[in-house]
């Protein structure tokens, strides 16, 4: 564990492909254990939204970095939910639209953008007990995390989860299109040059295809609590 003053900080890394359930279970566990939850995917989505709203090409690394350097990305807890703010505006729904979802992989693959976000993520993890989820937390962002989890699930089950999540948010997209988008996203995330989606050698793999959220939460919580006792 990392030491902060007289106390020790716990770092939990949860990685996996799109819609494997990372954010959902991470939020619940963080709430139950009193940890800070850091949604790294939301940070890259916010960067993508910033580019979109300023009519900047998603591959224009220099322009996007300049925009980010002059923007603020914040997380706030409101009514029991984590909200994402960009320059003081709540963009929690805006960053989940199909447009942003389809292009976040391109933005997150840009070296300087990734370096900037990783720097911010490590800074956050050095101040609190954290649960951080993403694609490269256990391999790149927090390689020394005490607990590393790698969640997987079938494309069909992940597409259904995203479809239902979109419905709740009032976003309409065909299920087959979502399945295709997930397959494309998986390929991009796994084959990008910088910090590709990859299971850390010391990560524990959990297949969530046939597990309920409560079951996944229970399994990961047990792993964390065992580590705390050591």
From Swiss-Prot:
Any single biological process term in GO: nucleobase-containing small molecule interconversion
Gene3D superfamilies named among the record's database cross-references: P-loop containing nucleotide triphosphate hydrolases (3.40.50.300)
Binding annotation for ATP: 16-24
The enzyme's E.C. designation: 2.7.4.25
Reaction catalysed by this enzyme: CMP + ATP = CDP + ADP; dCMP + ATP = dCDP + ADP
Molecular function (Gene Ontology), one example: CMP kinase activity
Alphabetically ordered keywords of this record: ATP-binding, Cytoplasm, Kinase, Nucleotide-binding, Transferase
InterPro entries hit by this protein: Cytidylate_kin, Cytidylate_kinase_dom, P-loop_NTPase
Gene Ontology, cellular component aspect: cytosol
Compartments where found: Cytoplasm
Homology family: Belongs to the cytidylate kinase family. Type 1 subfamily.
This protein's name: Cytidylate kinase
């Amino acid at each position: 564990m990392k030491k902060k003053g007289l106390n020790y900080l716990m770092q939990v890394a949860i990685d996996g492909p799109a819609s494997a359930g990372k954010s959902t279970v991470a939020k619940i566990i963080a709430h139950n254990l009193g940890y800070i939850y850091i949604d790294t995917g939301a940070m890259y989505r916010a960067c993508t939204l910033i580019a979109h709203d300023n009519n900047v090409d998603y591959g224009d690394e220099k322009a996007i970095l300049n925009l980010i350097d002059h923007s603020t990305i914040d997380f706030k807890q409101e009514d029991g939910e984590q909200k994402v703010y960009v320059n003081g505006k709540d963009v929690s729904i805006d960053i989940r639209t199909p447009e942003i979802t389809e292009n976040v992989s391109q933005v997150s693959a840009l070296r300087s953008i990734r370096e900037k976000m990783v720097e911010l993520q490590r800074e956050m993890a050095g101040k609190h007990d954290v649960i951080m989820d993403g694609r490269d937390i256990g391999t790149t962002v927090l390689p020394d995390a005490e607990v590393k989890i790698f969640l997987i699930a079938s494309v069909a089950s992940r597409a259904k989860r995203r479809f239902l999540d979109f419905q709740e948010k009032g976003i309409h997209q065909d299920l087959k299109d979502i399945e295709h988008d997930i397959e494309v996203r998986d390929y991009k995330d796994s084959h990008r040059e910088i910090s590709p989606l990859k299971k850390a050698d010391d990560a524990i793999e959990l297949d969530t295809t046939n597990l309920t959220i409560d079951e996944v939460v229970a399994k990961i919580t047990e792993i964390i609590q065992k580590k705390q006792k050591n």
